[in-house]
Amino acid sequence: MLTVHLAMTGDPATITIAAKASGDPFVEAMRELAGDIATFSHGPIDTMPERCEVLIGGGVDPEQLAAAEHLHTIIVPWAGIPEKLVESVAASERRDIAIRNIHHNAASSAEIAIGLLIAASRGIAILDRRLRSGDWRPRYEPRPTRRLDGSRATVLGRGAIGSRIARALTGLGMEVETLGRPPAGGRWEADQLVRRIEGGLVLIAAIPLLSETRGLINGQVLDAIPDGIFVNICRAEVVVEDDLYDRLSDGRLFAAGLDVWWRIPETIEEQMDHPPGNRPFQDLDNVVMTPKVGGGLGEPEIERRRAEEVAAILRELAT
């Protein structure tokens, strides 16, 4: 039997957004799906059993890793592997620890990317708002729009999410290029990206946040799609916030669709009144905004898939 610890503290960065001391749906699902091959404990990481072999979670410091002599696998129960986790494993010098992650919400994330793109290209949010007030004039007036059919899009990221986005864009009649890591490894430099995306209409970010992707999409990159559309469904920090805001506010970019943000509420009270950026994106009509819902957090079907994919990894480890 595997000894497994689910790191649950109620922190949105762990597993569920409101993990409880007992009866948590994720814990119950894991016991149902893998209780025959694993024993489970759950709670903050500092309550991890001494003989724990598998940790399910995303936040652990080097000292905890160094002390966990029997730990051989960390399963990150979402798509992106946290940058701090990679740094902690490296600092602990535990080269025997494998990091695994899952893609249970790839379809959901891809769908929100396509929805944001279409809404941004056609000004759907503004049209909706005006018609709710009884205003039909946009139907009869010239209005700014961008047609996707026949235009060119670049998807930054070739993973489970990026590949789904690319297939959907092709179905919309777009010419699509997906970019993974540079051929020689390492990181993309801005001038390299510019040469690949220059003259296109759409840039969609679907990459993990790592040291080499932080701030990757800067003003130079955004200027390569003049009057274009930028969509971000991965991590806000892959973009230079000021560069994006400035180009949206002065019209150098036609529009943006954003599901990820620089400021996330940390309390229930903040959830009711918390601007998502350090700049007032909420004041821009050419920005379509959603509150980090692409991953489907809390949706029963998505959470069930999360548990099933984690259980599948555990079964692989148990063989």
Show where each model-derived region lies.
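Short, conserved loop/helix-junction motifs that constitute active-site signature segments
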Residues: 64-70, 87-94, 220-227, 247-252, ...
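Glycine-rich NAD(P)-binding loop of Rossmann-like domains
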Residues: 128-164
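Rossmann-like adenosine-cofactor binding region
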Residues: 182-277
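Conserved beta-strand positions in the Rossmann-like core of class I SAM-dependent methyltransferases
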Residues: 177
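Short acidic low-complexity segments
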Residues: 40-51, 63-65, 185-200
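N-terminal glycine-/charge-rich "phosphate-binding" loop or analogous flexible N-terminal tail
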Residues: 1-54
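C-terminal helix-to-coil terminal segments
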Residues: 99-112, 126-130, 142, 262-319
